[in-house]
């Protein structure tokens, strides 16, 4: 019997990937470039389930998702709440005093804005948190960092400079299945 597939938007190490791994351990995870593709692979039968974030108690609604949900014919079968723990990370050898830029998803940046300001970093939006971590890994510029999950730091070989970088510790995102 072949394993079932659960899709998510983003790269490996994204928070949606963490939710897939936590609640659907017997499934193969399928990263998708966009929310639309994440849903399309369920519609066309490639995946059995899709995990999508819909709102965060700090950053609010994930606007793209609410628009897409109005136009799909899939059924919501579950919801999961996941505590988001953002970590500030950079390449090995980089330290806090050398940082100038931070990359992450717009929601992650808004959830860490006070800490970003304390470090006097320029923030730049990226498609997803794991994508930002991969970007930092492949970037030769000095002083760049990402805000992403611990899993992303492990996957992309980055050093965590500050754990739990979010401004508020009770940072919860609601995901629909």
Predicted feature residues:
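Domain-level signature for soluble enzymes in the chorismate/prephenate branch of the shikimate pathway
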Residues: 1-177
């Amino acid at each position: 019997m072949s394993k079932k597939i659960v899709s998510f938007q983003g790269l490996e190490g994204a928070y949606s990937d963490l939710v897939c791994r936590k609640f659907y351990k017997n499934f193969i995870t399928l990263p998708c470039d966009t929310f639309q593709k994440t849903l399309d692979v369920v519609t066309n039968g490639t995946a059995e389930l899709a995990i999508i974030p819909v709102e965060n108690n700090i950053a609010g609604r994930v606007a793209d998702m609410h628009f897409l949900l109005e136009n799909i014919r899939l059924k919501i079968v579950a919801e999961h709440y996941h505590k988001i723990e953002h970590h500030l990370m950079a390449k090995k050898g980089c330290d806090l005093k050398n940082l100038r830029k931070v990359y992450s998803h717009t929601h992650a940046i808004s959830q860490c804005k006070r800490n970003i300001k304390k470090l006097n970093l320029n923030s730049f939006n990226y498609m997803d948190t794991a994508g930002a971590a991969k970007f930092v890994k492949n970037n030769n510029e000095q002083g760049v960092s990402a805000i992403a999950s611990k899993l992303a730091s492990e996957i992309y070989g980055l050093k965590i400079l500050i754990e739990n970088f979010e401004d508020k510790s009770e940072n919860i995102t609601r995901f629909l299945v």
